[in-house]
Curated annotation (Swiss-Prot):
The gene is ISP1. PANTHER family: ECOTIN, PTHR35890. This is Ecotin-like protein 1. Belongs to the protease inhibitor I11 (ecotin) family. InterPro entries: Ecotin_sf, Prot_inh_ecotin.
Length: 146
């Protein structure tokens, strides 16, 4: 089994940012190209009232993909809004002073090609958290026209 190596000279994190590096399990070149995708899900863990937590929150933001010059290695830069947007439904009539912590993510995070040969390198704000998902599709199917 081969593992990715951190050989490319990835940039250092800028002030107010952190760099997260992780490896993806090898799936085979053909499967990685045709069946797998990586979804980066940046967000923040926010403290809020129970009523606010029952509503749907999102953090505006963007994920930009960059390439290490001369290496072809990809890395990602995340920008997140400072404040979350929220629905405004009144849900609980109980004490609103009770606080809970909730992960609030960027809405509709994009999918990126799955590449296990290089590490996944992501730069994001110091107070942000990164979660990710692996999407796997089956065999391609063709729609029939009438």
């Amino acid at each position: 089994m081969s593992y990715c190596k951190i050989e490319a000279p990835y940039p250092t994190a800028e002030a107010g940012e952190k760099r997260i590096i992780f490896a993806l399990d090898p799936k085979g070149d053909e499967a990685e190209q045709e069946q797998y995708m990586l979804q980066l899900i940046p967000g923040r863990v926010l403290e809020m009232s129970r009523n606010d937590a029952a509503n749907h929150q999102t953090l505006g933001g963007s994920i930009e993909q960059h390439t290490v010059e001369g290496w072809g290695a990809k890395f990602f830069h995340v920008k997140l809004a400072k404040q979350a947007a929220s629905t405004l439904m009144h849900v609980h009539d109980e004490d609103h002073s009770e606080k809970v912590r909730k992960f609030v993510a960027m809405p509709n995070p994009p999918l990126f090609p799955y590449r296990s040969r290089c590490p996944v390198v992501v730069y994001l704000p110091n107070d942000a958290e990164l979660r990710y998902g692996i999407w796997c599709g089956g065999q391609q199917m063709q729609a029939v026209t009438e």
